[in-house]
Regions:
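Acidic, glycine-rich flexible loop/linker segments
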Residues: 528-545, 707-777, 781-786
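Mobile "lid/hinge" segments at catalytic clefts and subdomain interfaces of large enzymes
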Residues: 199-322, 468-552
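Phosphate/diphosphate-binding loops
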Residues: 329-340, 441-527, 702-703, 714-749
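C-terminal segment of N-terminal export signals and the immediately downstream linker at the start
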Residues: 26-60
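Long, structured ligand/cofactor-binding scaffold of large enzymes
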Residues: 55, 60-233, 626-671, 676
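N-terminal export signals
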Residues: 2, 10-30
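Accessory "access/gating" subregions that flank catalytic or transport cores
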Residues: 163, 175, 180-194, 298-424, ...
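Non-catalytic terminal/interface segments that mediate subunit docking, oligomerization
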Residues: 118-120, 350-441, 565-697
């Protein structure tokens, strides 16, 4: 159904763009555009008010059960238990907990598949406040206005589908041009002490406002949207003590660049990074958000800062004084207990200390965000490693570094370059984080500073950070270098070229490096040549935490739901969106003699498994996007990407074509991964695509948290080698069997049998991390099937527990009773917390 056009004049009308913007059509809705929060409208304020009213009671119950000092992360986790009557000391890194988030969110590439899965539930509306932000599908090319015009036309089908779903089921809808989702959430939805789920790995950005926000796949999000329990392995806790105060060129970005180098891309797996210490109070809220955002690059579940005055200032500046007033009432419990801060090693699983006063700016890369280099070492490292020295593009922005403060610090460097007659040698692109920031920067004359250096100001969208970039500078077929204030620099991520060496830095360092155009330049020590031939040294950057005149008022952007019974039909010719058919359930038999699809060597991120760029528009069409499966995965047997052996045709082809051949001939297959397989983004397509192409098993040395969860939710058996050395036993033409599946159980290994080409066999053990409920998901074949079974088997939901009554009751006395027939058939399907309303259809 085509919805009426909505003028984006209010989104893009600025001093420089009003004439060009005119009226850009979008497919959002005919509903009223809501102004931004500074006008006094706080979305879902009743929910926030109830949260702060109940928080002390819930925390008292937690303290009564645990009887010990608590970290901030523990306070939020335990007060969000779905079944507080089952409260106990959950073992970190081992036990699973069921949680009840406060908010949810998604975007235009994670949203379609999540909503497609939600449609199968039969629910009439979502069960918790949620928002859809269209930020991923805008292709960066000519600039904000022309790029948004192209996006509206080329992404019509996706935007229309999301807008209809939002209007019908209850999502707030932010059309393209409104901002990058994490900045939109920070400005409008995040609040201290709350919990949020979003289908994006950089969701932890909200930790800058003291919110526990976690990136998930679409199936996990649907759990929350349906009011069901959302399950998480109880995270370990990494405490990061910050002391001192940042000096000179050092920025919040350098805190996380250094920390990522310390922890590596897997050091935070199944852990929450919690910052504490007096150094936290010297950082702005958006600076904290930058640090939390990129904590995802360590594999961390999320990151969080304690509530403080900087958060108050930010909330007030974005129209949320009422939230500040509520948070102040529980402020002492929006941070770790004093005993924890005094003796952190006793309460955190690992403690890292960073002295902000001595922190040096960093440049991390290339090809991995944990390749950390203090800026004083970059020149020597570049020459040692043979990095291409010329910087061909400088990119400022992304969800990591697009706040008002970020852009003002970069603008101060740019202004000095203009004033001192320094010519820029590298093309610059600037991405403000939201329309509010865009218009405020425009009002304050700061975007014109960049334009004077011939910078391209892009739309408030993800753009080059996720590969949505029509790059026209330099020759990408040869090794080349770019520098960016983004969060990830995996091969091929930004421009699709695996030859591009991408380096991560703060916005001000990126701006300074653009002047010399050389990765070996150190702006702290080096000089630049002015037009008059003088050697000029750049002064330290200066920025503004928040705009002195406040943010621009009356910024429109949000379309509110109307709950109309809009038709959600999808045309069979729609290339962007197609509804799902249920995957087949497990047949009860062992997997026997399955062919190896690929044995991946080295780093294999979700960008390798399901690349972005040109494929992003097809995230809502599982058949179409499955053509990119493991396009960038390196085959351990030939060292090449996109070339694997087909055991049936006896020829090499792409992983997608080989998997599709097997599927068409009713043959399942196996993927073997290296260490930290599936690190990076939360994209569930990296699990859904192999499931769709009948991959039955993923066996790896280790699995990244979100990807492992997505594999489980999509019905793929996710295994790890009991002995990582067994990875070397697997040969290219092996047949792989997984034995003992009829007896698979929590904490019990399975047997892997290899049948080599010569007929010889080898056996070894593999581990899994499934609990009883997750095994039932796997047996059922996929989560939507699980939801339907759950409705069919569940008993009426119990009344929601009274937290106050739980303080002295033992956990054993609070266990739920489950009908015996249900337990016998599906031990994991306990009473369902609210699905006795007849809204789910039977199988």
């Amino acid at each position: 159904m085509k919805t009426p056009a909505l003028s984006r004049r209010s989104l893009l009308k600025t001093a420089a763009a009003a004439g060009a913007a005119a009226s850009v059509p979008t497919l959002a809705s005919s509903a009223t555009l809501e102004p931004a929060a500074e006008t006094g409208h706080i979305r879902n304020f009743d929910m926030i008010e109830a949260f702060y009213r109940e928080y002390p009671k819930k925390l008292a119950a937690v303290r009564g059960h645990l009887g010990r000092p608590l970290t901030l992360a523990e306070k939020i986790l335990y007060t969000h238990l779905y079944h507080p009557e089952e409260m106990r000391e959950f073992k970190r890194g081992a036990d699973y907990v069921e949680l009840r988030p406060d908010r949810a969110g998604t975007h235009d590439i994670g949203g379609p598949m999540a909503i497609i899965q939600f449609l199968s539930s039969g629910k009439d509306r979502i069960a918790l406040p949620a928002a859809i932000v269209c930020d991923h599908l805008v292709m960066a090319n000519a600039g904000a206005i022309p790029d948004l015009k192209v996006a509206d036309k080329s992404n019509y089908e996706t935007y229309d589908f999301l807008a209809r779903a939002a209007k019908r089921y209850g999502f707030d809808f932010w059309p393209a041009g409104a901002g990058i989702c994490h900045q939109v959430f920070l400005e409008n939805y995040n609040f201290p002490g709350g919990m949020m789920l979003v289908t994006d790995s950089h969701t932890p950005t909200a930790g800058g406002l003291g919110m526990l926000a976690i990136g998930v796949g679409g199936a996990d999000l649907v759990d929350g949207l349906m009011g069901m329990e959302w399950e998480l392995k109880m995270p370990k806790l990494i405490g990061v003590k910050l002391t001192g105060r940042l000096q000179g060129w050092a920025s919040p970005k350098d805190v996380i660049l250094k920390l990522t180098g310390i922890l590596s891309t897997k050091g935070g797996t199944n852990a929450i990074i919690e910052f504490f210490g007096e150094g936290t109070e010297s950082l702005s809220a958006t600076g904290k958000a930058t640090i939390c955002n990129m904590g995802a690059e360590t594999g961390a579940t999320t990151s969080i800062f304690p509530f403080d005055a900087a958060m108050e200032r930010y909330l007030v500046s974005t129209g949320r004084q009422a939230v500040v007033d509520l948070a102040r009432g529980v402020a002492k419990d929006l941070k770790a207990d004093p005993e924890v801060v005094a003796d952190p090693a006793k309460y955190y699983d690992r403690v890292v200390e960073i002295d902000l006063s001595t922190l040096e700016p960093h440049i991390n890369g290339p090809f991995s965000p944990d390749a950390a280099m203090p800026i004083s070492t970059v020149a020597a490292k570049a020459k040692e490693k043979g990095f291409p020295q010329k910087l061909e593009v400088a990119l400022i922005g992304s969800c990591t570094n697009s706040s008002y403060e970020d852009i003002t610090r970069a603008a101060s460097v740019a202004k000095e370059m203009i004033d001192k007659g320094i010519e820029v040698k590298t093309p610059i692109m600037v991405v403000p984080g939201s329309v509010r920031i865009f218009q405020t920067l425009e009002r304050d004359g700061l975007l014109d500073v960049f334009r004077k250096l011939n910078a391209t100001v892009l739309a408030t969208a993800c753009g080059p950070c996720i590969g949505q970039w029509h790059r026209t500078t330099g020759d990408m077929t040869r090794p080349n270098s770019i520098i960016e204030s983004f969060n990830r620099n995996f091969a091929g991520r930004n421009d699709g070229s695996t030859k591009t060496n991408a380096f991560l830095a703060s916005p001000e360092i990126v701006m300074a490096m653009a002047a010399e155009g050389d990765i070996t330049f150190n702006p702290l020590a080096g000089t630049l040549r002015s037009r008059t031939g003088q050697n000029v040294k750049l002064a330290e950057p200066k920025g503004e935490e928040l705009p002195k005149q406040g943010f621009v008022k009356e910024v429109a952007g949000c379309v509110l739901p109307t709950y109309e019974k809009i038709d959600m039909a999808v045309s069979p010719t729609n290339e962007r969106i197609q509804l799902l058919s249920p995957f087949k359930p497990w047949d009860g038999k062992d997997f026997v003699a399955l062919p190896l699809l690929i044995k991946v060597k080295g780093k294999c991120t979700t960008d390798h498994i399901s690349p972005g760029g040109k494929w992003l528009p097809y995230r809502g069409n599982i058949d179409r996007i499955s053509d990119n499966l493991l396009e960038r995965g390196i085959n351990a047997f030939n060292g090449q990407a996109g070339k694997v052996w087909n055991t049936e045709t006896k020829a090499y082809d792409t992983p997608a074509k080989v998997a599709r051949y097997y599927k068409n001939h009713h043959v399942a297959s196996v993927i073997v991964g290296d260490d930290n397989y599936g690190e990076g983004s939360s994209r569930e397509h990296a699990a859904m695509e192999p499931r769709y192409l009948d991959v039955a098993v993923v066996l790896a040395k280790s699995l990244a948290r979100i990807h492992e969860s997505n594999l489980k939710k999509q019905g793929i058996l996710a295994l790890t080698f009991a002995d990582p050395a067994d990875y070397d036993k697997i040969r290219e033409k092996d047949r792989i069997s997984v034995l003992g599946l009829s007896e698979i159980a929590p904490n019990k290994t399975v047997v892997i049998e290899l049948t080599h080409e010569d007929g010889s066999k080898e056996r070894f053990e593999a581990r899994h991390s499934y609990n009883a409920k997750q095994l039932a998901w796997w047996r059922a074949g996929r989560p939507s099937t699980g939801w339907l079974l759950r409705k069919r088997l569940s008993s009426p939901a119990p009344a929601r527990p009274n937290w106050k009554d739980l303080r002295q009751k033992s956990p054993a006395a609070q266990r739920r009773s489950v009908p015996a027939a249900v337990v016998q058939s599906f031990p994991c399907f306990l009473d369902d917390g609210g699905f006795s309303d007849g809204s789910l259809k039977a199988l």
